[in-house]
């Protein structure tokens, strides 16, 4: 039993060590304040994302409004043009947030960023936003990434 407890603690600490806070650009968080953005694994920036893999994204933010729902939209910005970047779950209420969202409460939004095999090797800026039920942004952040083979 003691071994299982030690093993569990080791795994939990290892997983938390993989979550890398990244430097991000706020691109218009109108009704929220971003506290931290983590991409795992991303030990250096720009994040090097490998085709065929999926990356964990965790955003800690404080809401400045109430909302019954939330929706995530992700784009890759290539030469100034936003290109939709599909994610597994666009419903923020199914991504670590318990809805309804309350004013002045801090939330942890969690999702995956899958990098498809057919994506080209390219440098791109990822823009990730989460909106409320009035289409106002709880958060919007951007980070540079490099898609690699």
From Swiss-Prot:
Its main location: secreted. The modification N6-acetyllysine is found at residue 116. GO terms for molecular function: cholesterol binding. It catalyses: cholesterol(in) = cholesterol(out). Residues 1-19 form the signal peptide. It comes from the Eukaryota. Expressed in kidney, spleen, liver and mammary gland, but not in testis. One of its GO terms (biological process) is intracellular cholesterol transport. GO terms for cellular component: endoplasmic reticulum; extracellular region; lysosome. InterPro entries: Ig_E-set, ML_dom, ML_Npc2-like, NPC2-like. Keywords: Acetylation, Cholesterol metabolism, Disulfide bond, Endoplasmic reticulum, Glycoprotein, Lipid metabolism, Lipid transport, Lysosome, Secreted, Signal, Steroid metabolism, Sterol metabolism, Transport. SMART domains: ML. Intracellular cholesterol transporter which acts in concert with NPC1 and plays an important role in the egress of cholesterol from the lysosomal compartment. Unesterified cholesterol that has been released from LDLs in the lumen of the late endosomes/lysosomes is transferred by NPC2 to the cholesterol-binding pocket in the N-terminal domain of NPC1. May bind and mobilize cholesterol that is associated with membranes. NPC2 binds cholesterol with a 1:1 stoichiometry. Can bind a variety of sterols, including lathosterol, desmosterol and the plant sterols stigmasterol and beta-sitosterol. Binds cholesterol in a hydrophobic pocket; there are no hydrogen bonds between the sterol and the protein. Interacts with NPC1 (via the second lumenal domain) in a cholestrol-dependent manner. Interacts with NUS1/NgBR, the interaction stabilizes NCP2 and regulates cholesterol trafficking. Interacts with DHDDS. Interacts with NEDD4L (via C2 domain). Interacts with NPC1L1. Belongs to the NPC2 family. This is NPC intracellular cholesterol transporter 2. It comes from Bos taurus. The lineage of its organism: Eukaryota, Metazoa, Chordata, Craniata, Vertebrata.
């Amino acid at each position: 039993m003691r071994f299982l407890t030690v093993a569990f603690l080791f795994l939990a600490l290892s997983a938390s060590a993989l979550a890398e806070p990244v430097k991000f650009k706020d691109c218009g968080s109108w009704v929220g304040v971003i506290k931290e953005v983590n991409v795992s694994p991303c030990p250096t920036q720009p994040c090097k994302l490998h085709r065929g893999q999926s990356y964990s994204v965790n955003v800690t933010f404080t809401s400045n409004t109430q909302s019954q729902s939330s929706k995530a939209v992700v784009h890759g910005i290539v030469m100034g043009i936003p290109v939709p970047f599909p994610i597994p779950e666009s419903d923020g209420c199914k991504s670590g947030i318990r809805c309804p969202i309350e004013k002045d409460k801090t939330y942890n939004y969690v999702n995956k960023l899958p990098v498809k095999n057919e994506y080209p090797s390219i440098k791109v800026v990822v823009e990730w936003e989460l909106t409320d039920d009035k289409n106002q942004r709880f958060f919007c952040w951007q980070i540079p990434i490099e898609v690699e083979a």
